[in-house]
Amino acid sequence: MRSGGISVRRWGTALVASTAAFAVITPMSSAQAATGPSVGAKGAFLLDSKPNKTLWSKAADTKRQMASTTKVMTAVVVLETRGVDLNKKITVKQSYRDYVARNGASTADLKKGDKLSVRQLLYGLMLPSGCDAAFALADTFGTGTTEAARTKSFISKMNRKASDLGMANTKYDSFDGISQAGNNYTTPRDSAKLARRALGNSTFGSVVKATSTKQTATNGRVYTWYNTNKLLGSYSGAIGIKTGTGSVAGPCLVFAAKRGDRTVAGVVLNSPDRYTDAKKMLDWAFRTHTTMKLRTLPAGAEQD
């Protein structure tokens, strides 16, 4: 998707679906563990979620564009709205579809007039990276008399939430990652803080760990969405979280994996090989070696 010279990419390549294969997990030597992971990402961060302990980082506080990983905050603002009703129905407007078409954006392909619940739209937001779903949620949870006012209000809520969470080097100018002026940025450390917060919400966790979902609108239309995060179903214990790709941001990934009672969350920003980077970081955190065959997506599925 492109706007104001900053793009968040929508891929159209058709891929054949397959089942991911796991290799035997082997322990890592103490010497290898001491060196830390070697990753190609320009920025990265790794934390142990429960004790909130930093495990490793690279350029942790350097500000970078975040593309569609922005949508993690979109979801958090919705889910942490006081008295939020996840079953509330939202009617899809033509303006949501027009926005996607105008920006060449990733989409949940929402149809005008369909009514879906807030919970369903969270799946449409986080799995296919639907900018139309993001628009619908921002339009609903913002305040004001016009769409422009409501979405602006929602973005203000995103920035207030970032401030509340101590994300001092993060700014949002977008509800979905399409930045008009390049003022939509974060740092690996800030993004990891947000990931940890988000994973504390059970609804968020259920959404982002799903590799696919079928959701039925009130008129009976069935939406099938596939998760753009290929780490799911490919890396043992992976439980999320969100992809993002942009012309300035590059490929980004906010990710997490759980083994036993331990949850590790990580971030890579502007990575030439985000899944390999994530695998290396998680292997290092869990002190294991794995090989990984990436889950592929069906023909026509959104890729971000």
Predicted regions and their residues:
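Penicillin-recognizing serine hydrolase domain
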Residues: 35-43, 51, 139-304
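Active-site-adjacent loops and short helices of periplasmic peptidoglycan-processing enzymes
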Residues: 24-27, 31-189
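Secretory targeting and sorting signals
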Residues: 1-33
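A generic short-segment signal for beta-strand/edge and adjacent turn/coil regions
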Residues: 11-13, 44, 57-62, 89-93, ...
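Hydrophobic alpha-helical segments, especially transmembrane helices
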Residues: 10-11, 72, 259
